[in-house]
Every structure is written in C-alpha cells, then in structure tokens.
From Swiss-Prot:
Belongs to the TRAFAC class translation factor GTPase superfamily. Classic translation factor GTPase family. IF-2 subfamily. GO terms for molecular function: GTP binding; GTPase activity; guanosine tetraphosphate binding; translation initiation factor activity. Coiled coil: none annotated. It comes from Aliivibrio fischeri (strain MJ11). This is Translation initiation factor IF-2. The gene is infB.
C-alpha cells in the first residue's frame, strides 16, 4: 500500500494545501506538503474538524464539511429621475456536506435526538402547566378587583340616585308653589284691571254729562249775544263771529278733557257731530263748521303711533350712512345718534362696513338681510358647462435662473431643436409662452424674465406653473437671483428641476453647485433628496433631451389633468397695448377649449375674442389646455396673472367687469388712507418700531419747543415720535402737503388752517387736530402711542380638580371622575394635567358632565366627569388645573 502524502490528500478532498496544513497545525500535527499521512493522523484531523464544526463525540460519525462562498456583482437599477443607478450586490452561500459511515451510529444519533425531543416536550408541558396556573391566579385576582369596583360603583350610583330623587321631589314642590303663586297673582291682576276699566268708564260718562250741562247753561246767553250782532256779519267766518265766551268755554272744556285719561269706551255719533245746534242755517252752519274745524278731544278716534315700522334692510359689504337711513325710513341724524351711542363717529356721507351697519339697524329694531356684492360675479362664474371628464395635459414649465447663466440660450436651443424650420426660421418669439413637441409628449414653456409674472401669479393664487427649471452655471455657482428663484418655487409649492449649465467650460464644477444648493434645501436624488439634477450645455446642446425627459418624468409623477371639452378658463401671462390692434393679452388655457368668438372675462376687462394667434403669429380657431395664445378684442389691458374665464352673456360680463373696477378703486382709495390716531396700530408692521409722524404748528416759538420736547420724551423702544415739521404761525398748504407725503398727523396749538390747507386736508384725508391746552395734546398723543403697543397676556388659575377615579367611554375614551377642590372648572377654558405637581399635558376639555348632563361649569365641592381632548393617560391622583388667559392693556409709563 502506497503512502499518502499531504499534497495527494489535499487533491483527493479538494482542499488547498495551505488550508490543509493549517488544519493539521490546528490539530497539533506539524506536517509539510511532501510528508506522508498515516491513518491515525487522518483520524486525529477528522476528530479535530468534528469538534470545530459542532460534533459532540469523538466516535465515528458522519463527516460534516461546511463551505462558505461570497459572490459580488453590480446591478443597474432605474432611478425615479430617469437615470440608472449601479447597485453593488453581494451573495453569500453556506453549504454543509455530511457523509454517513456507519448505520449503527446513525441509529444511535436518531435515538439520542428522539430522547432529547421527548425531554424538551416534557419540559414544555411542565412550563405550560405552570403558566396556566399563574394565569388562572391572575384572572382570579382581577375578577376580585372588578367585583370590588362594581360593588363600589353600584353603591355610588345608589347614593346619586337617592340624591337625585330628593332633588326632583324638592323641585316638584317648588314648581307647585310657584304655579299656585302665579295663579293667585293672575287673578289679582285681572280684578285690578276690571276695576280700573269700570272706573275709567264712569269718569268718561261724568265728563260727557258735565260738557252737556255746560252747553245747556250757556245756550241762552249765546243766543242773546248773537242777536246783538249786525246783519252784515251773518256770513262771517266762525272764528270771527263766535263770541269770546263760547271760545273760552270750549277751550276750558278741552283743557279739562285733556287733563283726564284718554281711554274711553264711547265716541260721538256721526249724526250728533254733523247736526246744527239750533234750527237756523246761519248758526247751524257756524256750529257745524266749528265742530269740523275745532274738534274736541272727545271726538278723536285714534292717536298716531310713535313707533317706526320695522323694515327689511338689505346691506351690502359697504353702505353710506345716508343710504342706510333711507332704507330704514328714518333721518340720517337718527342713525348718527345711534352710532354715537355705540361709540362710533360718522358723517352723513361716510361709508361704513357691513358689520357696523348691521349693528346699527338691529339696534333700531329692523331686520337685516346681508347681501354679497359679488353675487352676480359668483353667478356668472358658476354658470359654466364643464361636466366632461378630465384628461391628461401637458406640463407648464417656467425656466428661471440668474443673469448670464444660460436661461435664454437654453430656451432658444429647445425652440430650434423641437420646432420645424418652416415655422421657426427667422421668426422671433413675440409672446411670453410657447410649446414644443417631443417624442414623449408636449411641453409648454413660460418665459418670465425678472420673475414678475411668476410672482404676480403666486400672489393671486393662480397655479399656472407646474414645474420650475432652475438654470445654474457650473462655473459661477449659486447667485442672489438663484436664491430668489428657489424661494419663489417653494412659496408656489411646485417641484424644482436643476439644470447645471455650461459644463463644457473650463473651471466648471457641478459638484460645487450641488453643495451650494444643498444649503438651501435643494437636495439631489443621488443624495437621497427629491430634486432632479441634469448636466447640460445650452451652447453645444449637450443633454438637452435629458432635461426634457426629466420634465416629462416629473409631470407623470404629478399626474396633471384638465377638462378638454367645455368653456375655457386660463390665466393671463402678459398683456400689452398694440398700436394697430388695441389691447393684446397672452392667455395660457388651463381647462376647456377657447374658441374664436367666445366672450372672455379677464379681471377688470371683458370682450369677445375677435382674433386668436399662436406663438408663431398664425391665426387659429381654437386652443386646448396648456396651449398659449394671443387674443384680441378685450375692452382694456388686463393685469398679468388675472384669471381669464369664458362666460355666456356679454352684458353680465360687462357688469362684473364694472363691479371689479369699482371694487379695485375702493381698495386703492382705502390703501391711500392716511395715518390717524384711531387706526395707528393697524398701520404698524410686525417686528418694526412703530413711528408716529407729526407736523406741529403753534402760535409762539416757546410753545413749539415745549411741545416738541414733551412729545420726543414720550418715545420708547417700541413706539417712536417723529416730528417731521414744526413752526410758528397758521397751518398752510405746505404743511398739509408735507403731512400727506410723510403719512403724518397735523397738530395745531392755538392756530388754525387756512382755506387752501383745509382743502388739501380734505382731499388727502389727513388727520388735523386743534388744541388750546398743552396737556390735552400730550395726553391724546400718549394714548394713541399706547394703542400701538402690543398687548400682554397673563394666565390666571381659576379652578383645580382632583382625579378620584377613571372610567372608559367608547366615544370619549378615558373619563376622569373628579372632585373640584378649588375655584370653578369651566368647559371653555384651557387646562393642564398635573402628576406629582409636574405638568404632563396642556390642552382643552372635550367633555364636562355632572350626573350625565353636559354642564358649562362646576363649582368647588362638587363632583364631575372630565374628558380631556386628545389625551387618555389620566390616572387616579392626577390634578386637572383650569386657567384663563387675561389680556393686560399696556400703557406708556
């Protein structure tokens, strides 16, 4: 038998010689590759390997060999930005080979394994039995605890039920007593009213009898006096011929009647009122005339009501005081009096807001109907037929960047590369938007130099832009206008694609651009961000197609859709006044289809589309979503960013445009409102020192210096008095002009304004005040400055409740059963939850109940249920603290 060497053994078992020698060395056998290996040495090596690979005994057992392998490869994966990424993949494999040498050993191993499994099974069963016993013990303890809680709860409910029964009984008794007292009071009142009525009727009858007796007593004397009159005076007027005694008697009767109560049950009969006193026509005529022209108080049938009839007053967003008075059928002075009582000063021609007018009208007892002035506008804009389904549309892209970073070059190259030569050759782009066709779809570009249009659209809320492409030069980096573009894009909430331009120039460093943009939260996708970076060269045309693909990929993520059929709506990109064609507006259609002849409402302008052209100057008949067009036929030049909407009726469009013009004029006038002492705080911008500009004029120089020194001493860190002009003498037009230019108030001390100055003050709506006492002037300015100070707020604890128990509610979660220990718990106030005198939660109450009834507050010494909003970790022993925020009015020290 030939001897087996180490080298031959390594070839036989497929193991490198070095590894086999190492294994021999680990087993305590020193060998070289040429040495022979005996059976004993092989057995020793096998035992060592078995120990190393987990064998438990040294006897002959299956040989176990474990192989571990590593495989590395590179996998190309497509990224979200359209670029592929290389990912390193490492595969690890582990295999174990076992060789059976003896059947007995295998059986023995199986027997040992079965015994081990049986032992493990017995141990698991014993553990399960122990766990069941522990679980049963815990359940018994919990059951006992629940029974105790249920018993305590039943006891509390019984006590509460008894208390409620007693309270209900007392309430019923009190109600019965109140009803009995009310019944007795009603009976007494009815008896008193009946007695008063009888008494009034008796007095009225007595007065009638006295008047009749007086007339009978004086009738003979009247006849004698009348016979003494001349015949020429027979036809004289009643007021001339009636004797003074008769007039005195009638006046006395009238005065006596007026002193008595006016209430009576009888009226004079019509026949008695028309019949003459005697048989003669002369005296009968006089008597009849006297009765008609001078009726007594006994003949009056009704008194004119002093109350004003209630009116339904329709009030718009603003209304003039005189118009409000006319709608309420009262004089304007009455309205001004009511406003003065309410603390508001107004003139007859002053415009007041809707809220003030509503308070005045309701104070005077009228019903108010609030009207929106833009009802017609809303009706016109809602009368549209856009019931079609939305379809995919092309993205609208705005390219921004710093000056000389290649923005215009990028636009020009895209236009030359993707527009046919017949259309693009020699034609200069003459509108601010155009669209290009690519293999994957259409893209619309907006050219907004200086970001003017983009800012205007963002300010008006018109999301005309879907994607912003930021062009940054690789050799120049981030510049101020680049930062401005980033801010515009983030404010508008649109995604940002960065085009790193000029990569073909020497000194280009795209990585530096990434690092600088990362400081402004523009992170590349390679770094785990959301912004796509594309390296391009606008001059050479390098990777321009990649930029377009990135734009289309981003638009697919946005899933842009629009209604293609129906009445169109869009936004005005730019507008101008052409010499030969009139107002021209570039409109980007956002939804629907714009057709030639449609009636368009653009902001404050309107008109019928007389002509429509694309970006190449060609006449077209219609345009769909994401298509920019030039339209002619508007009444004026609209503003950039105005919404363009197709409407049905030209007359209504004109009315809406006129309303918008008037509203814009009112807003403009309101913005020109000069600073006044009453609204100075509204004119103060947050974070800045408020300034009160003053133009001061006095009668003597000493007064000017004293007042100026006192006013300047009033200045603080938050409010500053700035005297822009001062002098001696009357207030002139120059002073009024200075105050208008500097938004100042005019203070006159013992001086007055001349006619031209008063006219300027009225035209510019300035605040002019006269004073004769210096302390009144200083006190009013000081009060105005105090109103400009920001208010302070202080928290005051108004109640404290102790948590006695916690209940679970399916609707409100954890409900804390509490006892109010201090103050009052109010539902509307904020709260804090304290545990061990440490605040663990601050919020508000969601529920406050007492005896299952929602209450507004619970006072000291009463129990209540409290549910804390958005907080369920209330425990027994916690404290719930209720506080209120009190505003402290600040004044100048």
């Amino acid at each position: 038998m030939t001897k087996l060497t180490v080298k031959a053994l390594s070839e036989e078992i497929g193991t490198p010689v070095d590894r086999l020698l190492q294994q021999f060395s680990d087993a305590g056998i020193n060998k070289k590759d040429g040495d022979s290996v005996s059976e004993g040495e092989k057995q020793s090596l096998l035992v060592h390997l078995k120990k190393e690979h987990g064998s438990a005994d040294d006897s002959a057992s299956p040989t176990r060999l474990t192989l571990q392998r590593k495989t590395r490869s590179t996998l190309s994966v497509a990224g979200s930005g359209g670029k592929s990424k290389d990912v390193q993949v490492e595969v690890r494999k582990k295999r174990t080979y076992v060789k059976a040498s003896a059947l007995e050993e295998e059986k023995k191993a199986e027997q040992l394994k079965a015994e081990a499994e049986e032992q493990a099974k017995r141990d698991a069963e014993e553990a399960a039995v122990r766990e069941l016993e522990q679980k049963a013990q815990r359940e018994a303890e919990e059951q006992a605890k629940r029974e105790a809680e249920a018993e305590a709860k039943a006891k509390r409910e019984a006590e509460e039920k008894a208390k409620r029964a007693e309270a209900d009984k007392a309430k019923k008794e009190m109600t019965k007593k109140n009803e009995q007292a009310k019944k007795e009071a009603d009976e007494l009142k009815a008896r008193q009213e009946l007695e008063a009525t009888r008494k009034a009727e008796a007095e009225a009858a007595k007065l009638v009898e006295e008047a009749r007796k007086l007339a009978e007593e004086n009738e003979a004397r009247w006849k004698e006096e009348e016979q003494k009159k001349s015949a020429a005076e027979k036809d004289a007027d009643y007021h001339v011929t009636t004797s003074s005694h008769a007039r005195e008697a009638e006046d006395a009767a009238d005065r006596k009647e007026e002193q008595q109560p006016r209430r009576r049950k009888k009226k004079a009969k019509p026949a008695e009122a028309a019949a003459p006193r005697g048989g003669r026509n002369q005296r009968g005529g006089r008597n009849k005339k006297a009765q008609v022209n001078k009726p007594t108080s006994m003949q009056h049938g009704f008194d004119k009501s002093a109350t004003v009839a209630k009116q339904d007053v329709a009030i718009g967003e603003t209304i003039v005081v005189s118009e409000l008075a006319s709608k309420m059928s009262v004089k304007a002075t009455e309205v001004i009096k009511v406003m003065m009582k309410m603390g508001a000063m107004a003139t007859i021609n002053q415009v007041i807001d809707q809220e003030t007018a509503q308070l005045v009208a309701e104070e005077m007892g009228h019903k108010v109907i609030l009207r929106k002035e833009n009802e017609l506008e809303e009706a016109v804009l809602s009368d549209r037929d856009n019931s079609a389904e939305a379809e995919g549309r092309a993205p609208v892209v705005t390219i921004m960047g710093h000056v000389d970073h290649g923005k215009t070059s990028t636009l020009d190259y895209i236009r030359r590369a993707h527009v046919a030569d017949a259309e693009a050759g020699g034609i200069t782009q003459h509108i601010g938007a155009y669209h290009v066709e690519t293999d994957n779809g259409m893209i619309t570009f907006l050219d907004t130099p200086g970001h003017a249009a983009f800012t205007a659209m963002r300010a008006r809320g018109a999301q005309a832009t879907d994607i912003v492409v930021l062009v940054v030069a690789a050799d120049d980096g981030v510049m101020p206008q680049t930062i401005e573009a980033i801010q515009h894009a983030k404010a508008a909430g649109v995604p940002l694609i960065v085009a790193v331009n000029k990569i073909d120039k020497e000194g280009a460093n795209p990585d530096n651009v990434k690092n600088e943009l990362a400081q402004y939260d523009v992170i590349p996708e390679e770094w785990g961000g959301e912004n796509i970076f594309v390296h391009i060269s606008a001059k050479q045309g390098t990777n321009i197609d990649g930029l377009l693909e990135a734009i289309l990929l981003q638009s697919e993520v946005l899933e842009l859709t629009a209604v293609r059929e129906g009445m169109a709506s869009g936004v005005v990109v730019e507008s101008r006044l052409d010499k030969g064609r009139g107002p021209v507006a570039t409109v980007l259609v956002q939804s629907g289809t714009l057709n030639k002849g449609d009636i368009v409402l653009c902001g404050q302008e309107y008109g019928r589309v007389r002509a429509m052209r694309d970006e190449n100057g060609k006449d077209i008949e219609s345009a769909g979503p994401s298509i920019p067009v030039e339209i002619l036929g508007l009444s004026g030049v609209p503003a950039s960013g105005d919404e363009a909407t197709v409407v049905r009726d030209e007359r209504k469009a004109r009315e809406v445009a006129n309303y918008r013009q008037g509203k814009f004029r009112d807003v403009k006038l309101a913005r020109q409102q000069k600073a006044k002492l009453e609204n100075m705080f509204a004119n103060m911008e947050a974070g800045e020192v408020a300034e009160l500009n003053v133009v001061l004029k006095a009668d003597v120089q000493g007064s000017v210096e004293a007042i100026a020194d006192s006013l300047l001493k009033l200045s603080t860190d938050e409010v500053k008095v700035n005297i822009v002009g001062s002098g001696v003498g009357g207030i002139t037009e120059t002073d009024a002009t200075l105050a208008a230019a500097s938004n100042a108030i005019i203070l006159g001390f013992n001086v007055r304004a001349d006619a031209t100055a008063r006219r300027t003050v009225e035209n510019e709506n300035l605040d002019l005040r006269y004073y004769s006492i210096i302390y009144q002037l200083i006190d009013e300015v000081k009060a105005a400055m105090g109103g400009m100070l920001a208010p302070e707020f202080k928290q005051e604890i108004i109640g404290l409740a102790q948590v006695r128990d916690v209940f679970k509610s399916p609707k409100l979660g954890a409900i804390a059963g509490c006892m109010v220990t201090e103050g009052t718990i109010k539902r509307s106030n904020p709260i804090r939850v304290l545990r061990d005198n440490v605040v663990i939660y601050e919020g508000e109450l969601e529920s406050l109940r007492r005896f299952k009834d929602d209450v507004a507050e619970v006072k000291n010494g009463y129990e209540c249920g409290i549910g804390v909003k958005n907080y369920n970790d209330v425990r027994v022993g916690d404290q719930i603290e209720v506080f209120e925020i009190v505003e402290i009015k600040r004044t100048l020290d």
